[in-house]
Regions:
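A beta-rich soluble binding module of mature secreted/lumenal proteins
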Residues: 1-148
Length: 148
C-alpha cells in the first residue's frame, strides 16, 4: 500500500478506556490517524481508525472510522529502541487484510527516518525469527520530502 505514497505520518492518541475498571493511564484504546501523499500529488489524504488491545499489550486490532468502518486489521509490536542521539523507533507486524498483504513496518519518531545501520541491524534480528523472516526481506523505504 505504501510503495506509491510519500510523507507517511502516523499519530496515536490515547482514548478513554473501554471499561471503567481499566485505569486511564493503561487505556486499551488508541485513536489512530495516518496522513500521506501520493508520489505525484500535493493533496494530503488521511485514514482514521481506532486501535484496541488484542490480548497482550503488544497486540492491537484496528477498525476504520467513517467509510472505512468495514475495514479492520491486526498488528503487533515486535520491538522498539532508540538510536544514538535519541531517535526512537518501533517495528510492527501487520496481518493480511482484504486490502493489504501481511508485512512489517519500521517507524521512526524523527522525520529523517532511521540510519541505514539501524535498519540493517533490525533486519538481521528479524531474519532470526521464523514467523517473520521472509517479510523482513521485503521492507522498503518510504519517500520523505518537504511536501507534508
Amino acid at each position: 500500500m505504501w510503495k506509491s505514497k510519500r510523507n507517511v505520518q502516523i499519530t496515536y492518541t490515547l482514548l478513554p478506556p473501554s471499561s471503567q475498571t481499566i485505569p486511564a493511564e493503561q487505556t486499551d484504546r488508541l485513536d489512530d490517524v495516518v496522513s500521506y501523499q501520493s508520489l505525484d500529488s500535493a493533496k494530503v489524504s488521511t485514514v482514521h481508525g481506532v486501535d484496541k488491545i488484542a490480548g497482550s499489550h503488544d497486540a492491537w486490532d484496528w477498525r476504520g472510522r467513517g467509510w472505512l468502518v468495514i475495514a479492520g486489521s491486526h498488528w503487533e509490536v515486535l520491538g522498539w529502541g532508540e538510536e544514538e542521539g535519541g531517535n526512537a523507533w518501533c517495528v510492527t507486524y501487520f496481518a493480511k487484510t482484504l486490502f493489504t498483504p501481511a508485512g512489517i513496518d519500521f517507524y521512526s519518531r524523527g522525520r529523517q527516518g532511521l540510519r541505514p545501520e539501524t535498519v540493517e541491524a533490525i533486519k538481521e534480528g528479524l531474519a532470526g525469527i521464523e514467523d517473520v523472516k521472509d517479510l523482513a526481506g521485503s521492507v522498503f523505504e518510504i519517500k520523505v520530502d518537504d511536501g507534508n
